[in-house]
Amino acid sequence: GVMVMILVLSVMNGFDHEMRTRVLGMIPHATVESPTPVSDWQALARQVERHPRVEALAPFTQMQGLLTHEGKVQKVLINAIDPEQERKVSIIDGFFQEGSLDSLQPGDFAMVIGDKAAAKLGLKLGDKVTFVAPEVTVTPAGMFPRLKRFTVTGIFHVGAGEIDGALALANISDLARLQRWKPDQVQGLRLKFDDLFQAPRSAWEIAQTLDGDFYARDWTRSHGNLYQAIRMEKTMIGLLLLLIVAVAAFNIIATLIMVVADKGGDIAILRTLGATPRQI
């Protein structure tokens, strides 16, 4: 029972550590966004930073689309970031196989990509890859999808298939240009709290204090499957520990009953000689 308990706790603690350090270290605890581009994200950041649980924040813009290279296609979510600010809210810097965040300089249209997506597309450092945006450009010749060539300047491996196979990073001003925004316009802010499990309440409190058409969304909503996995993990730990304790208690009781039954003859002799139950 003790061996099984130690084994179960070790496995669950390892799972919890990997979940926290890898997956939860990559996604924001919450985001503050607006339906329209945010022109002065620094002013928004000053409002958000007033909340006592906010440890760090960084601007971001997201865009879904397709990457194509030599006839191969892969769906992708581009997270456009400011490399210096992103280090405050994400641990991506520690998972690069090649390149680094510093390669994402404005105007270069550089991109870093997960190793699974790179392998599927046959990409290596320095290759050109075409991003196909889910929008069209209207010209006198007709409508054409919006395309942009990026240069692969980094490859990372986090160890989570959802991230390694479908996430790419680019500079935030480059994606603003691709979306025909001003270079300093962003979609919103990524937040990091001192306690990620307080994110729902903290995000709600922040949303109540913001002026304008802003809304906050915490990680339990944006990554609901991950939240359910963590809840299931905690429930399973409780059930397994309860089962292990019950089995151990049953073994102890069974052993005591067998010992008493085995000593039945000796007890009868002692009672015949006049010994009281207390003396026995």
Question: Where are the predicted features?
Answer:
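Hydrophobic alpha-helical transmembrane segments of multi-pass inner-membrane transport and secretion
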Residues: 1-13, 231-268
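Mechanotransmission and gating elements of multispan inner-membrane complexes involved in transport
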Residues: 36, 135-138, 143-237
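Internal alpha-helical transmembrane segments
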Residues: 2-4, 8-18, 22, 26, ...
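Membrane-interface junction motifs in transport/secretion proteins
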Residues: 16-46
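Amphipathic alpha-helical segments that mediate coupling or scaffolding at interfaces
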Residues: 18, 22, 155, 192, ...
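A structural signal for hydrophobic secondary-structure junctions
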Residues: 46-184
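Short amphipathic alpha-helices in soluble, non-transmembrane regions
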Residues: 44-49, 92, 202-209
